[in-house]
Amino acid sequence: MKLRMNRREFGIGTATAIAALSAFPTFAGGKLKVAGIYTVPTQQKWVARLHLALDAAAKRGEIDYVYSESTANTDYVRVMREYCDSGVNMIVGEAFGISKEARKVADDYENIAFLMGDPFKPHGNNFSVFDNYIHEPCFLMGILAGEMSKTKKLGMVGGYAIGEVNRLFHAFMDGAKSMNPECEFKVTYIGSWYDPPKAKEAAFAQIEAG
């Protein structure tokens, strides 16, 4: 079953992951066995919504849930395959940095459902994708920043220079320019999805630079 979810179906609220699970049939062997694989700690907000929803479903007895957090992209495929070999029915996670590799795993395990955060299209019959649309609130943030800024200089700190991050930055810049076309922007990438001290350091460096 191919499934692509928009922002109203997936991405906000603790029920999102459970809504995704309902798209798949009940397994004859009993409860659905779900594995979550996350590249950041589960307290990171983007991942937290998935983790909390799946954990709540497990506590209600609806699914069996295991997970791995802070899994590097270089180790992600190995972890995927280990969970597949362990007998899970479904893997939920992120494929932003390993889109092709994750799809290859799905090809090798056709009886397992994959629900992955990913900007590209679904793949085969068992690889479904979701994404968020937070470029829209980023545009609104830009409007506020462009209106409030006295220096016309605005800074942005992101994880990696990839399309999913840059679309947020461009939305922010478009919003700011809609209020003040003379705004200038400083962008810093910290090379991590979750490193609060490094993000703070980058932000202060931008402030000191004006």
Please provide the spans of the model-predicted regions.
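Extracytoplasmic "Venus flytrap"
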Residues: 33-60, 66-76, 96, 161-167
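Structural motif
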Residues: 65-84, 191-207
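Periplasmic-binding protein-like
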Residues: 88-95, 115-117, 210
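A short helix->loop->beta-strand "cap" motif at the edges of active sites that frequently abuts
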Residues: 110-112
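Extracellular/periplasmic Venus flytrap/periplasmic-binding protein
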Residues: 166-210
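Short beta-strand elements at the ligand-binding edges of bilobed clamshell
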Residues: 122-147, 156-164
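C-terminal segment of N-terminal export signals and the immediately downstream linker at the start
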Residues: 3, 24-37
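N-terminal secretory signal peptides and thylakoid transit peptides that target proteins
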Residues: 2-18
